[in-house]
UniProtKB/Swiss-Prot annotation:
Swiss-Prot/TrEMBL GO biological process terms: mitochondrial electron transport, ubiquinol to cytochrome c
Organism of provenance: Cryptomys hottentotus choma (Choma mole rat)
Binding-site list for heme b b566: H97, H196
Keywords, alphabetical: Electron transport, Heme, Iron, Membrane, Metal-binding, Mitochondrion, Mitochondrion inner membrane, Respiratory chain, Transmembrane, Transmembrane helix, Transport, Ubiquinone
Cofactor binding, note field: Binds 2 heme b groups non-covalently.
Lineage: Eukaryota, Metazoa, Chordata, Craniata, Vertebrata
Residues engaged in binding heme b b562: H83, H182
Cell compartment(s), UniProt: Mitochondrion inner membrane
Gene behind the chain: MT-CYB
Name of this protein: Cytochrome b
Miscellaneous comment in the UniProt entry for this protein: Heme 1 (or BL or b562) is low-potential and absorbs at about 562 nm, and heme 2 (or BH or b566) is high-potential and absorbs at about 566 nm.
A molecular function GO annotation: ubiquinol-cytochrome-c reductase activity
Length: 379
């Protein structure tokens, strides 16, 4: 008798994706983050669903409904803080996942890579709209400032901003539509994730060495399922510690003040996972220039395959490229710190230099160093 997982039409799909999936025998823990992102997405959808049951998307009651969830709903505080800090864990996993893709040359699997960039855009949009929903000071002013960036688009900019707002300022209509989009986008992200996996399983996973591994593959279960489970436990413990001991560590104190259109906070800044983009945006004194730089922080990832000049896929055997990669990581961490600082000397100057370095490394130095390494290896 044939095993049900190999004969049943639905089980067969699950079997080929998660059980008998041929996987390179040498992939490291850096490959855990894809499955961790899946777990984070499920966690966000479940906690978000429970929050939506108690949240009211009206500017007069939104702030107090969040307070009601934390005070009066059974374990409401746990659900709310798991959702808020779960977003932070999501972005940590997301950035590590993208970083691993750059380090090991996974961007050469173009369909999977481009679908991943679409997913990154979608997750960023979802997180931004979710940050607006508590209707605190930083929610309101963050929404006002970020949506206002679209006014930099020539001719249609102002009309576009008013169309998104549903009026002449961020108001009731804005909150209602942001809630609607924030609710539906995670399900769209889930569908896009399935397509992302579909493209990945067409080509098979990359591996640290960057060479073809078709001759040396092992089944995903139990070898990697147990490894992924360890990753789940590790992230779950960190998230639980954050939620139970320091739930507001990554939040902004201004968001505990109800939104007031007549009182601007001294320093408007987004959540920590957008700070490096925020730093790049404000390092250019021109509005349109800043918006273009902001957009290109992600668009630059799309052209990564075109910038690949090395004869090797992975950076595993390329020490000079490795050095550049870790300088890029340090640069992004510096930009994150700069984004949290006020707009004054020396932070503006440091921000301008680090923004320039970010684009220089990816667009100029990485391709040049790769060509040098080819010469050194006489390729």
């Amino acid at each position: 008798m044939t095993n049900i997982r190999k004969s049943h039409p639905l089980m067969k799909i699950i079997n080929h994706s998660f059980i008998d999936l041929p996987t390179p025998s040498n992939i490291s823990s850096w490959w855990n983050f894809g499955s961790l992102l899946g777990i984070c997405l499920i966690l966000q959808i479940v906690t978000g669903l429970f929050l939506a049951m108690h949240y009211t998307r009206d500017i007069t009651t939104a702030f107090s409904s969040v307070a009601h969830i934390c005070r009066d709903v059974n374990y409401g505080w746990l659900i709310r803080y798991t959702h808020a800090n779960g977003a932070s864990m999501f972005f940590i996993c997301l950035y590590v996942h993208v970083g691993r893709g750059i380090y090991y040359g996974s961007y050469m699997y173009t369909e999977t890579w481009n679908m991943g960039i679409i997913l990154l855009f979608s997750v960023m949009a979802t997180a931004f709209m979710g940050y607006v929903l508590p209707w605190g000071q930083m929610s309101f002013w963050g929404a006002t400032v970020i949506t206002n960036l679209l006014s930099a688009i020539p001719y249609i900019g102002t009309s576009l901003v008013e169309w998104i707002w549903g009026g002449f300022s961020v108001d009731k209509a804005t909150l209602t539509r942001f809630f609607a989009f924030h609710f539906i986008l995670p399900f769209i992200i889930t569908a896009l994730t399935v397509v992302h996996l579909l493209f990945l399983h067409e080509t098979g996973s990359n591996n640290p060495s960057g060479i073809d591994s078709n001759s040396d593959k092992i089944p995903f279960h139990p070898y990697y399922s147990i490894k992924d489970f360890m990753g789940f436990l590790f992230v779950f413990v960190i998230l639980l510690a954050l939620v139970l001991f320091s739930p507001d560590l990554l939040g902004d104190p201004d968001n505990y003040t109800p939104a007031n259109p007549l009182n601007t906070p001294p320093h408007i800044k987004p959540e920590w996972y957008f700070l490096f983009r925020h730093a790049i945006l404000r390092s250019i004194p021109n509005k349109l220039g800043g918006v273009l730089a902001l957009v290109h922080t992600i668009v630059i990832l799309i052209i990564m395959p075109l910038l690949h000049t090395s004869k090797q896929l992975s950076m595993m055997f390329r020490p000079m490229s490795q050095c550049l990669f870790w300088i890029l990581v340090a640069d992004l961490l510096t930009l994150t710190w700069i984004g949290s600082q006020p707009v004054e000397y020396p932070y503006v100057l440091i921000g301008q230099h680090t923004s320039m370095l970010y684009f220089t490394i990816i667009l100029i130095l990485m391709p040049l160093v790769s060509m040098m390494e080819n010469k050194m290896l006489k390729w």
